[in-house]
Amino acid sequence: KEVVVTKEVVKEIPKEVVVTKEVVKEVPKEIVVTKEVVKEVPVTTTEVVVADLDPGELVIYSGRKESLVGAIIEEFENLTGVDVQVKYGKTFPVATMILEEGDNSPADIYYAQDPGGVGFLAAEGRLVTLPEDITGAVADWAKPADGSWVGISGRARVLVHTATLTDLPSSCEDLTDAKWKGKLGWAPTNSSFQTMITGMRTMWGEDKTRQWLSDMMANDVTVYPKNTPQVAAAAAEEISIGLVNHYYLHRFISESGDSFNARNLFLSDGGPCSLVMVSGAGIVDTGKNRANAEKFLRFMTSKVAQQYFTGQIYEYPVLAGDHGVKTHMLLPSLEDLNKPDLSMEDLSDLTGTQVIFRDLGMLD
């Protein structure tokens, strides 16, 4: 702004005031003129703002549901300004889509519900080796040795059962007992169930696994399309027990309260039905936004994202060392679970499991 004085001339000089005829008092940060009219004349100024560089985009192919991961992906987008596009679907079909698209696939990130999906894509050579600062943040049990992908959150297999049920099984083998005939549920097309059976093949071998599956079918196990309806069916006493991931029950309880008529049983025998697996993600080799893909994985393995998965989705953290991320108070700690000693590589052969399922008519 300029200062214009009528009749008298006031000239402002740094640290000194010169006045003709009249007396001017200097007051910090303002000028007081005696007997004179002062006009403020607006002066046009130009402010130059240097815009940030375009943060770019990121394309995610997700086998995890939007209801589970949409909020945390949106948080990444808000924090970074990256334009994120997500294609949602089932884990194995999404992986197959990337293979079919070949070099033309727009996917930068493949985000799978379980180790089988990312393990499958890694075996096909479609995932790059991740930087050590990304893999180093994740615990050894939650990632493969070759660094092709990392676990994002931990999920335990459980038996969800009607809350009033007291005579509970203690292992997978118990479920083939005649007393459970017509009272069991499973979801053969669900990739988490397929991953559990893949681990069973590693632990028991092909023959015993096939026999267990056949015995379960002979016990009139009810087939469901996914985990959620099994939890609802157990609560409604349509079945007594379902084979699911642990966190689905807590979503029902959060909506219906503690009176919801179902509970989880974490088997303590260390067998296949007590498996703890991970959702996982890797960078697709043909992706065009590598830097943003790495930024996304760093975010998803940060304490902020890990606390989202534990606090909002009731899953387990996968970080290495003393990370300080709290497991939800409704869950047993990861250290208290007697999970089988299986590597992520042991859980990758979903294709072999699907062959067995087709042979037995489980995917019809």
Residue ranges, per PLM feature:
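Intrinsically disordered, low-complexity Ser/Thr/Pro-rich tracts
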Residues: 1-57, 76-77, 239, 364
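Early extracytoplasmic/lumenal segment of secretory-pathway proteins
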Residues: 47-120
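A structural signal for short loop-to-beta-strand junctions that line the ligand-binding cleft
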Residues: 105-110, 128-158, 173, 183-186
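Ligand-binding "clamshell"
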Residues: 121-129, 141-147, 252-267
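A bilobed periplasmic-binding-protein/Venus flytrap-type ligand-binding module shared by bacterial periplasmic
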Residues: 158-165, 201, 276-289, 308
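Short loop->beta-strand "edge-of-pocket" segments that line small-molecule binding or catalytic clefts
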Residues: 174-194, 199-201
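Periplasmic-binding protein-like
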Residues: 182-191, 299-323
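Ligand-binding pocket segment of bilobal, Venus flytrap-like solute-binding proteins
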Residues: 189, 202-267
